[in-house]
Amino acid sequence: MNPAHLLILSAVCVSLLGAANVPPQHLNLYQFKNMIVCAGTRPWIGYVNYGCYCGAGGSGTPVDELDRCCYVHDNCYGEAEKIPGCNPKTKTYSYTCTKPNLTCTDAAGTCARIVCDCDRTAAICFAAAPYNINNFMISSSTHCQ
């Protein structure tokens, strides 16, 4: 093997070994998904690209009641982000599920409790709102201005 290639391969291996020691960020999205499943009867995946606000980002006016649930959830996360050190997308929390009831169990006023309450409220809202298949995967450039 060419010595230059061997040197590059060694550097890549060392970098990968170093990266293996970095703990992964725990995303609360898994917990949010489980809350959605607990509170409702629809598959959680149907909310990923729904309307203008369900999924990453959001703009314009929510297209319906379900999309408004996502809009409110986005704003709730925005409020949580105002707490120093609180990242709602990575903050894990404690809760119980006795289908369809959800209970957040972290101490009131903590980042974890606030994020849990955001997710709980959204999951309950999703379960109550009608689902319009025509608003799944809509064009944001056309419908969300």
Swiss-Prot record:
Keyword Metal-binding listed: yes
Enzyme Commission (EC) number: 3.1.1.4
Binding site for Ca(2+): Y53, G55, G57, D74
Disulfide bonds: C38-C97, C52-C144, C54-C70, C69-C125, C76-C118, C86-C111, C104-C116
Positions of the propeptide segment: 20-27
Primary residence: secreted
Catalytic activity annotation: a 1,2-diacyl-sn-glycero-3-phosphocholine + H2O = a 1-acyl-sn-glycero-3-phosphocholine + a fatty acid + H(+)
Function statement: PLA2 catalyzes the calcium-dependent hydrolysis of the 2-acyl groups in 3-sn-phosphoglycerides.
Family: Belongs to the phospholipase A2 family. Group I subfamily. D49 sub-subfamily.
Protein name: Acidic phospholipase A2
Classification lineage: Eukaryota, Metazoa, Chordata, Craniata, Vertebrata
